[in-house]
Amino acid sequence: MTRVLVLYYSSYGHIETMAGAVAEGARSTGAEVTIKRVPETVPIEVADKAHFKLNQAAPVATVAELADYDAIIVGTGTRFGRMSSQMAVFLDQAGGLWARGALNGKVGGAFVSTGTQHGGQETTLFSIITNLMHFGMVIVGLPYSHQGQMSVDEIVGGAPYGATTVAGGDGSRQPSQIDLAGAFHQGEIVARTAAALVAARN
């Protein structure tokens, strides 16, 4: 059975919600799916004052376990057009896995959240994808078979590089059904691609 990890960092819950949809999409293929988050690096008292969502159900991941999965789909909110420092710190610790090629040939994908429509969605996706490519991973985005990203009738997330959502400057906008459908679709396609690669190797 194909093993998929949905690995995320979420300050306010938007990416946590998207991660659930990504996982549902991957599970729809019959894959074994695990959702985990990276450790919070902001001091708890500071995070609490900033109203971070600290009571998230997903367990905290370890770097060593990344090698146990056939696919890893990484999600985070943007920080000035790039991935959050929490996610960057976590991935930066994977040098040992990189050195021994432990992630070579595994499937990777990315999904993100920004405060505004033009707040760095694609550059944040690229910052994650670049990292995964250095690990030797095969990247799967969000193809236009997800028609929702073609809509101009409302604010929608989604790019060919990965699923996205727009949280609003004050965080009041939650992922829409179109955003969640994109996340589901990406999870499904990543899992199917990973299954095909595993079967080909066997």
Swiss-Prot record:
NAD(+) binds at Y12. Substrate binds at W98. Belongs to the WrbA family. Binds 1 FMN per monomer. Keywords: Flavoprotein, FMN, NAD, NADP, Nucleotide-binding, Oxidoreductase, Plasmid. Its cofactor is FMN. This is NAD(P)H dehydrogenase (quinone) 2. It comes from the Bacteria. One of its GO terms (molecular function) is NADH:ubiquinone reductase (non-electrogenic) activity. Signal peptide: none annotated. InterPro entries: Flavodoxin/NO_synth, Flavoprotein-like_sf, Flavoprotein_WrbA-like, FMN_Rdtase-like_dom, NQO. It catalyses: a quinone + NADH + H(+) = a quinol + NAD(+); a quinone + NADPH + H(+) = a quinol + NADP(+). It comes from Rhizobium meliloti (strain 1021). HAMAP family: NQOR. The keyword Manganese does not apply.
